[in-house]
A protein has these predicted regions:
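Serine-hydrolase catalytic machinery in alpha/beta-hydrolase-like enzymes
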Residues: 52-63, 70-199, 212, 218
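A domain-start/cap signature at the N-terminus of enzymes
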Residues: 33-75, 87-105, 168, 172-177, ...
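Flexible "cap/lid" loop of the alpha/beta hydrolase fold
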Residues: 232-249, 266-267
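Bacterial N-terminal signal peptides
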Residues: 21-31
Length: 361
């Protein structure tokens, strides 16, 4: 022991150069060490309320198992279909397990409609769905054949111009896009979320709303990528020609879908719903993806190019590149108006997690 103490006494103090090296290493490693884990508490109640004006908006959150170990977790917000709620996607065990394995935070907000004043189906309002008209003021449906789905809020506010309107009209204080912007800001500032890996996915009516991202820079600037499952924009509401900072977009449709029919490959004509008595007018899948590609700055042609994708998908793009880097991807399955989550969800997560928000967006 005495010999050990003598050795300590004889140790030389670090030189100035050695001290500088130690300080530099600490400076470089310090942020990495402190940023390795999450220092923000999780929401105790998975069902949260976000008050916007006089309206309560609800959302449910599911954390991955390793959430607290990471300061920057990827986030996917999931928009349910018409008549759904925050449980529509999150009650699916396989969907949650797949996201958990990839370390993804899932958040599912609830649309409006089930409460006052509509007391009906929850919905998301997107371009044309509340007014019932195209940009040129023409009906978005064949009103002679399509039933009147107008919500009480649409009749009372007189927002609905025609009987083709079919989603809520509670957007006087804020729109659904406003809600999503507020939700992303809340999650980014109060939870351990990577601001460069925030994504938006919608199914059916939720997928319809996704395309309005091109018209909302406040939202598009926050997103690394978006995905729409079996949801298309109404006639005339394609991505503007000079949209700024568009995130990458994935569209998954069913070739046998009669509700939001995608049309044939490279067919840019408007498609028409043909389920029962509904006759709504939508932009085709090819027109939607081609317009998004052009708005992203890609020189597009009239024919989409096949892109390698896992079976049973047939995927094509109007911009050159692989599945991991094209700005817009059109993928189709032989199915009707359904999700086929077992195939669609892994493809969507791969599409999302291979992309980060462009710096400066």
């Amino acid at each position: 022991n005495d010999r050990f103490l003598m050795r300590l006494i004889r140790l030389k103090p670090p030189s100035v150069r050695q001290w500088c090296h130690l300080v530099l290493v600490g400076f470089l490693l310090g942020p990495m060490i402190t940023a390795a884990s999450c220092d923000r508490p999780v929401f105790v109640n998975p069902l949260q309320v976000l008050q916007i004006g006089s309206i309560e908006r609800h959302f449910r959150i599911v954390y991955p198992t390793n959430y607290s170990a990471n300061a920057h977790n990827p986030l996917v917000i999931l928009l349910h279909g018409w008549g759904g709620n925050e449980d529509a996607f999150l009650d699916q065990d396989d969907l949650r397990r797949t996201a958990d394995a990839r370390g993804v935070v899932l958040v599912a907000p609830r649309g409006l409609g089930s409460g006052a004043p509509d007391f009906g189906n929850n919905s998301w309002t997107f371009s044309g769905s509340d007014t019932g008209v195209t940009e040129a003021g023409m009906p978005i449906c064949d009103a002679a054949l399509t039933p009147d789905y107008r919500y009480p809020s649409c009749k009372a506010s007189k927002i609905a111009v025609t009987t083709c309107a079919w989603t809520h009209c509670q957007g006087q204080s804020h729109t659904d896009i406003d809600f999503l912007v507020e939700l992303f800001v809340l999650l980014e500032t109060q939870q351990c979320i990577d601001p460069d890996r925030m994504y938006l996915m919608g199914g059916s009516n939720g997928g319809n709303l996704v395309w309005d991202v091109a018209r909302a820079p406040r939202l598009s600037n926050k997103l690394a990528a978006v995905a729409s499952w079996i949801g298309l924009p109404h006639q005339s509401y394609l991505a503007p020609g000079k949209a700024s900072a568009l995130p990458a977009a994935l569209l998954i449709t069913g070739t046998k879908d009669t509700t939001d029919p995608p049309g044939a490959w490279d067919d840019f004509n408007v498609t028409t719903t043909s389920n029962q008595t509904d006759r709504y007018f939508y932009e085709s899948a090819s027109a939607t993806i081609r317009a998004w590609s052009a708005a992203s700055g890609c020189p597009v042609g009239a024919v989409a190019t096949p892109v390698a994708a896992p079976p049973p998908f047939d995927c094509r793009a109007y911009c050159p590149g692989e599945r991991q880097d094209v700005p817009a991807l059109d993928c189709r399955l032989e199915m009707g108006h359904e999700y086929r989550e077992g195939d669609a969800w892994p493809l969507t997560l791969d599409f999302f997690l291979s992309r980060h928000r462009a710096r400066g967006s």
